[in-house]
Amino acid sequence: MRRYAVMSSVSLQDFDAERIGLFHEDIKRKFDELKSKNLKLDLTRGKPSSEQLDFADELLALPGKGDFKAADGTDVRNYGGLDGIVDIRQIWADLLGVPVEQVLAGDASSLNIMFDVISWSYIFGNNDSVQPWSKEETVKWICPVPGYDRHFSITERFGFEMISVPMNEDGPDMDAVEELVKNPQVKGMWVVPVFSNPTGFTVTEDVAKRLSAMETAAPDFRVVWDNAYAVHTLTDEFPEVIDIVGLGEAAGNPNRFWAFTSTSKITLAGAGVSFFLTSAENRKWYTGHAGIRGIGPNKVNQLAHARYFGDAEGVRAVMRKHAASLAPKFNKVLEILDSRLAEYGVAQWTVPAGGYFISLDVVPGTASRVAELAKEAGIALTGAGSSYPLRQDPENKNLRLAPSLPPVEELEVAMDGVATCVLLAAAEHYAN
């Protein structure tokens, strides 16, 4: 499958002054017509649609009256159990192809755990730290771009110096990463390994092995391996999941990876189960702090999810429903981008096989203008630059499209409007 749509050999940039002027007049007229429709459409976040949330309606009645015992006899109604119940941990271990001992099950948000492990490293240091990160003169963090804005918000909150590296089709630019980690101030990096937000790119095993084996100057260096879209295919095929913790152990770096995933875009976005996969030493460090923060996760909800899925194949069955719901929306976005923009050579976009986003690169210098025009037309887009640390896209060209929430009919109107805004911003750029 194509990863990036091919740009036209003819570009708006090649139009002479008269032709670009006429084109600008025409597209401005279309934009004014768009504004007159008083639209109110939202493409900002990768939220599941109501149809997708309905797939998990059965959860609202689970585990059911009298069903409160986990497989090991744990009464899920009571306190305790920092690791989570084995029922749901085993399902996720089977789904990801890892030992169940590697998996901790938590509450709804894996992002909460990411914040915890970074904040605890900052306050206390992690189990490989010489001192807390807050005592370091500078903490630097590697950020593959374009990437996930909420990741960058966490490292921004702690004042880390964020260093951008390209997110390529096979994963982060490893030549750049391997050079950066020679600096002991570089303490970690973000990675979304499967159907990455927003490009849809997937880390290859070769890149994963390089991440596992590379020498780092900081002994407490950590990779936050956020496998948010591990099973979120748009086709009938599921991606191969890399046992990244196992790779780290095999390479002699068992504590390098903090790996995460969750059911947030599988069942109910605000009421699911998160999973933390890491080494035995890291788990001991984590539960040592987590046991002070709280007494344990929502085990009733974990049991409900275990009953709902049944086994790993049950998870895949649910994901096939999601794929059937999402694929027509992604296809509609790609169809409109191709029909409206391809002939003018003003944009390039990813063609993902899974995940929740399409990454759109417009004429450099115009992304913020496209977002501004879209807002004027009643179409909300994620802010230009949001896929970069500190919201600063050096080329001002990237926009993230989130097709999941609106019905196809609304999505078609919104994307036709976005295409008009891309063309108008490009025409303004080349006319000046």
From Swiss-Prot:
Family: Belongs to the class-I pyridoxal-phosphate-dependent aminotransferase family.
Keyword Transferase on entry: yes
EC code(s) of this entry: 2.6.1.1
Catalysed reactions, semicolon-separated: L-aspartate + 2-oxoglutarate = oxaloacetate + L-glutamate
Keywords from the named record: Aminotransferase, Pyridoxal phosphate, Transferase
Keyword Cell cycle on entry: no
Subunit structure: Homodimer.
Disulfide bonds: none
Family annotation (InterPro entries): AspAT_Ic, PyrdxlP-dep_Trfase, PyrdxlP-dep_Trfase_major, PyrdxlP-dep_Trfase_small
Residues at which substrate binds: R45, G46, Y148, D149, R150, R400
CDD domains xref list: AAT_like
Name of the top EC class for this enzyme: transferase
Cofactor: pyridoxal 5'-phosphate
Annotated consequence of substituting S264A: 30% decrease in activity
SUPFAM superfamilies assigned: PLP-dependent transferases
Gene3D superfamilies linked: Aspartate Aminotransferase, domain 1, Type I PLP-dependent aspartate aminotransferase-like (Major domain)
Positions of pyridoxal 5'-phosphate binding: S109, S110, L111, N197, Y229, S262, T263, S264, K265
Result for mutant: Y229A: Loss of activity
Protein name: Aspartate aminotransferase
Signal peptide: none
Any GO molecular function: L-aspartate:2-oxoglutarate aminotransferase activity
